[in-house]
């Protein structure tokens, strides 16, 4: 059996504040990978800003939800050629956070600025809206300085991500304000929640639930970012487990198929304070029970490294798409798990 040790790092950020990056497993096999060069081909005059979300559909196309001068949703084909922009000028687009594609190829966007989770069909037509956008007459939209929404059944507060179980139930990580996970049925009717407006570090509490995924059994995996862990719940949102040896879990995804894998990113923090790169940046590949199989990647501004991984897609467990905030890019990673090697002490 592989022996894993853990380490704990404290780093002082600019201005003197303390960044505590929780335990990371050591002696973990490094999974080699290639990053596809020149992946995205945008038309002349069209630009991408911060890449907040990325998701693939059953045809191999991928969607990017980006913050530029305006929040925009782009579609690209398998080769990375631009296909179209979806919903330009949409009332639901203000401050992009995540995009996901469900098993029927419906497109879901999670917008932190409008407090909305929006379901669209493959053609881009709106089918469902969860949440409520603050009215313009009430002041700023729900950015960091905007109004905080109450933790009501259908009112979200800077939500972060969305996922579904095999029955079509919807799970939303209602992240920056409400510190909870909410379960709705396939028609958007409230069923249950875990967590509360007040952040906490108990087994049913969150401090910025930033990403969410559901496996084939209906278990729910939550990237509990500011608590430096990943929490696992059953389908009724009862606590099952906590994985706290993977650094700061920013995003999580579960691959489909008969053998599902769990991926989570220990993303380097915004701002890249001195010392943080040495302890952050990698993505972990795990069994659903928390067993770490390997890791790949590192913090870097260069191609092939990661500059604040925000979301990822693992429809194919050996082809991982990552969206990065501070490099304004999406990378397509081709993993080589059979060539993984243990690098002690890294």
What are the language-model segments listed below?
Residues 21-346:
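Eukaryotic scaffold repeat domains enriched in small/polar residues
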Residues 5-16:
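Bacterial N-terminal signal peptides
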């Amino acid at each position: 059996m592989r022996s894993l040790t853990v380490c704990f790092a404290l780093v002082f950020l600019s201005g003197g504040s303390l960044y505590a990056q929780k335990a990371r497993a050591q002696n973990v096999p490094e999974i080699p990978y290639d990053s596809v060069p020149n992946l995205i081909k945008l038309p002349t005059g069209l630009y991408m800003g911060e890449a907040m979300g990325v998701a693939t559909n059953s045809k191999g196309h991928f969607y990017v939800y980006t913050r530029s001068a305006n929040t925009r949703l782009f579609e690209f084909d398998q080769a990375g050629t631009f296909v179209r922009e979806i919903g330009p000028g949409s009332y639901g687009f203000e401050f992009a956070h995540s995009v996901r594609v469900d098993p029927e190829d419906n497109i879901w966007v999670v917008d932190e600025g409008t407090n909305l989770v929006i379901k669209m069909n493959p053609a881009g037509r709106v089918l469902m809206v969860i949440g409520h956008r603050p009215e313009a007459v009430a002041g700023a939209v729900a950015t960091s300085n905007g109004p905080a929404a109450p933790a009501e059944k259908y009112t979200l507060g800077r939500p972060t991500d969305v996922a579904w179980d095999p029955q079509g139930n919807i799970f939303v990580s209602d992240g920056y304000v409400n510190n909870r996970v909410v379960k709705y049925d396939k028609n958007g009717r409230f069923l249950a929640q875990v967590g509360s407006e007040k952040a906490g570090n108990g087994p049913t509490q969150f401090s910025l639930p930033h990403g969410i995924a559901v496996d084939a059994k209906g278990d729910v995996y939550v990237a509990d970012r500011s608590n430096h862990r990943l929490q696992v719940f059953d389908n009724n949102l009862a606590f099952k487990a906590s994985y706290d040896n993977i650094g700061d879990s920013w995003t999580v995804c579960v691959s489909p198929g008969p053998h599902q894998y769990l991926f989570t990113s220990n993303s380097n923090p915004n701002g890249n304070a001195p010392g943080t790169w040495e302890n952050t940046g990698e993505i972990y590949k795990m069994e659903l029970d928390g067993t770490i199989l390997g890791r790949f990647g590192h913090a870097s501004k260069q191609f092939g490294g990661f500059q604040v991984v925000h979301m990822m897609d693992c429809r194919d467990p050996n082809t991982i798409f990552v969206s990065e905030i501070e490099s304004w890019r999406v990378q397509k990673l081709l993993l080589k798990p059979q060539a993984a090697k243990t690098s002690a002490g890294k």
